[in-house]
């Protein structure tokens, strides 16, 4: 019978070290990740993607955490230092940043497995019984204690968190596994072009979420073997998991948030369309991802900013926002904002109309602009009278990126402004 006693769970989380892999580029986000890693991507009006796995760790009772960084890491490191520096080492708590440092070779991190291997000495110093390896570039809420309990009680060497996804969505994007009735993994293929479907549903498959639990010494042994294999790509999905499923106990854990009915939310915001859509979903009256749940808060760096302000109330010049998230420091000055997410210190000037927009911090939209279904990168200044999102041929001609679903990306470079905002 499963043991879910508070003492059992608290012992598990205390004996666990979490390693968040946060070095990914996010190439399918194109210019949006030219100056930041995917885990440093802004989300939901005030957060960054990395805040979600970090908050899940803290809320689950896991207080020893390493954040592995590599690509364009400055903004990510700065955010973690500012927002997550409150842990007390004397109480056994820590959030450590682990940049690529050529610890065991002259190469930078060569893959997900190599990123962990090069930090073995740091993990060993923590003396954990279990190591939880987490993807740093997904938006979700999850109580990791449930997965830890399932791992311990199954006697597994490794546990892989998974969920059912459409075959078309998984193709080329996710690791796909086959499992026996007891959830033991019997087959695994990394990002196949033609994923194996579920026996009971030809339209869906079982996809890895990139979250793993290992027994510590077992993990170290497998990483050493992988490091000695000259043909390995140093990747958990491509190399480690396929090599161990036959001779070792690898189990799948079906993703569930552990936060109650209807709370199982997980999104890969790895494309411009999915990033835009995930932000738009937050605007419904009862969004599937509840950022207002005080029982499972999402922590982040809190800037000291004045409240949002809406000014002018004339018939043709009324500052207003409907069905929107408007963050601190924003000023809506005689403009109309509808179904949009505005991050900190955005200013929308008079007579402009904004709809379906995700606007990152420090953006200024000057007068008489009409913007629809756009993502505006940090620090942009939209010139007066500009119309974007209403004619995609014109948008492309001006150098903006238009997605297959009609979302328009605007960056400082596209506007001819100096680069470098993170």
UniProtKB/Swiss-Prot annotation:
Q: List the Gene3D superfamilies.
A: Hexapeptide repeat proteins (2.160.10.10), Spore Coat Polysaccharide Biosynthesis Protein SpsA, Chain A (3.90.550.10)
The protein in question is named Glucose-1-phosphate adenylyltransferase
Keywords assigned by UniProt, alphabetized = ATP-binding, Carbohydrate metabolism, Glycogen biosynthesis, Glycogen metabolism, Nucleotide-binding, Nucleotidyltransferase, Transferase
Residues holding alpha-D-glucose 1-phosphate: 109, 175, 190-191, 208
State the source organism's domain of life: Bacteria
Q: Which CDD domains match?
A: ADP_Glucose_PP, LbH_G1P_AT_C
Under NCBIfam families, the record lists: glgC (TIGR02091), PRK00725.1 (NF001947), PRK00844.1 (NF002023)
Q: Which family does it belong to?
A: Belongs to the bacterial/plant glucose-1-phosphate adenylyltransferase family.
Pfam families in alphabetical order: Hexapep_GlmU, NTP_transferase
What's its EC? 2.7.7.27
SUPFAM superfamilies membership:
Nucleotide-diphospho-sugar transferases, Trimeric LpxA-like enzymes
Subunit annotation: Homotetramer.
What chemistry does it catalyse, as a reaction equation? alpha-D-glucose 1-phosphate + ATP + H(+) = ADP-alpha-D-glucose + diphosphate
Sorted alphabetically, the Gene Ontology BP terms of this entry are: glycogen biosynthetic process
Q: What does the UniProt function comment say about this protein?
A: Involved in the biosynthesis of ADP-glucose, a building block required for the elongation reactions to produce glycogen. Catalyzes the reaction between ATP and alpha-D-glucose 1-phosphate (G1P) to produce pyrophosphate and ADP-Glc.
Q: Which InterPro entries match?
A: ADP-Glc_PPase, ADP_Glu_pyroP_CS, GlgC_bac, GlmU/GlgC-like_hexapep, NTP_transferase_dom, Nucleotide-diphossugar_trans, Trimer_LpxA-like_sf
What the entry lists under PROSITE patterns is as follows: ADP_GLC_PYROPHOSPH_1, ADP_GLC_PYROPHOSPH_2, ADP_GLC_PYROPHOSPH_3
- What is a single molecular function from GO for this protein? glucose-1-phosphate adenylyltransferase activity
The pathway is:
Glycan biosynthesis; glycogen biosynthesis
Q: Looking at the keywords, is ATP-binding present? A: yes
Lineage, broadest ranks: Bacteria, Pseudomonadati, Pseudomonadota, Gammaproteobacteria, Alteromonadales
């Amino acid at each position: 019978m499963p043991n879910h006693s508070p003492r059992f769970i608290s012992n598990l989380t205390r004996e666990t070290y979490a390693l968040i892999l946060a070095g990914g580029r996010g190439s399918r986000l194109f210019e949006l990740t030219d100056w930041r890693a995917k885990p440093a991507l802004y989300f939901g009006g005030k957060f960054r993607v990395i805040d979600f796995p970090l908050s899940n760790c803290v809320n689950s009772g896991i207080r020893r955490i390493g954040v592995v960084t590599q690509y364009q890491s400055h903004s990510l490191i700065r955010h973690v230092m500012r927002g997550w520096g409150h842990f007390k080492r004397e109480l056994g708590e820590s959030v450590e940043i682990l940049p690529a440092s050529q610890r065991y070779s002259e190469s930078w991190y060569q893959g997900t497995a190599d990123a962990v291997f090069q930090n073995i000495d740091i993990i060993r110093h923590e003396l954990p019984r279990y190591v939880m390896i987490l993807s740093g570039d997904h938006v979700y809420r999850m109580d990791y204690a449930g997965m830890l309990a399932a791992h311990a009680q199954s006697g597994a060497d490794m546990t892989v968190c998974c969920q059912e996804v459409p075959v078309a969505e998984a193709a080329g994007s996710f690791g796909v596994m086959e499992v026996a009735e007891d959830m033991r993994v019997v087959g695994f293929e990394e990002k196949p072009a033609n994923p194996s479907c579920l026996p009971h549903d030809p339209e869906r498959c079982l996809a890895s979420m990139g979250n793993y639990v290992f027994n510590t010494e077992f993990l170290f042994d497998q990483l050493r073997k992988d490091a000695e294999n000259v043909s390995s790509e140093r990747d958990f999905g491509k190399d480690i998991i396929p090599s161990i499923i036959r001779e070792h106990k690898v189990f799948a854990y079906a993703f569930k948030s552990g936060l109650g009915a209807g709370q199982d939310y997980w999104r890969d915001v790895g494309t411009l369309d999915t990033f835009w859509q995930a932000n738009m979903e937050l605007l419904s009256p009862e969004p599937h991802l509840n950022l207002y749940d005080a029982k499972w808060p999402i922590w982040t760096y809190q800037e000291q900013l004045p409240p949002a302000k809406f000014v002018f109330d004339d018939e043709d010049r009324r500052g207003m926002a409907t069905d929107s998230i408007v963050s601190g420091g924003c000023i809506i000055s005689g403009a109309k904002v509808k179904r949009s997410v505005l991050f900190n210190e955005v200013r929308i000037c008079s007579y402009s109309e904004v709809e379906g927009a995700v606007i990152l911090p420090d953006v200024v939209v000057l007068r008489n602009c009409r913007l629809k279904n756009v993502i505006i990168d940090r620090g942009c200044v939209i010139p007066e009278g500009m119309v974007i999102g209403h004619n995609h041929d014109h948008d492309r001609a001006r150098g903006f990126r238009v997605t297959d679903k009609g979302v328009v990306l605007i960056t400082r470079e596209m506007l001819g402004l100096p680069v470098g905002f993170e």
